[in-house]
Amino acid sequence: MLAPKKQKFRKAHKGRVMSKAKAGMTLAFGSFGLKSIDGWRVTARQIEAGRKAATRCMKRQGRLWIRIFPDVPVSKKPAEVRMGKGKGTPEFFAVRVSPGRIMFEIEGVEENIALRALELASAKLPVRTRIVRRYE
């Protein structure tokens, strides 16, 4: 799973995804991409599940780029623990995805296979998405 090698701080604020994406809104590598419509927090496990679904559909042909990286540590307290006594320990990593952000890109497969792969990857993510394509 994706996780940063080093961190400046062990724990992070919860934060919110408020504005539209400022960068990463256009296709940079592939011909087809998966663009977010909502702003939400996507975990490393969800990214990995989407990657596996897409590569399985593509039968390991072509190329898949993941344009997001989970760099925000999400902390959690154990079950049945009373309030207070500090913040919980970091459990997993997530990325805050803004509306308009390209998350996955595909190149080197037929159009119908690429669209199907991105649909399968989209089903694994908690954000509403749409498929975009490069017109040349």
From Swiss-Prot:
Organism: Rickettsia prowazekii (strain Madrid E)
Physiological role: Binds 23S rRNA and is also seen to make contacts with the A and possibly P site tRNAs.
UniProt cross-references to Pfam families, sorted A to Z: Ribosomal_L16
GO CC annotation: cytosolic large ribosomal subunit
Superkingdom of the source species: Bacteria
InterPro entries on file: Ribosomal_uL16, Ribosomal_uL16_bact-type, Ribosomal_uL16_CS, Ribosomal_uL16_dom, Ribosomal_uL16_sf
GO biological process, one term: translation
Source organism phylogeny: Bacteria, Pseudomonadati, Pseudomonadota, Alphaproteobacteria, Rickettsiales
Protein name as annotated: Large ribosomal subunit protein uL16
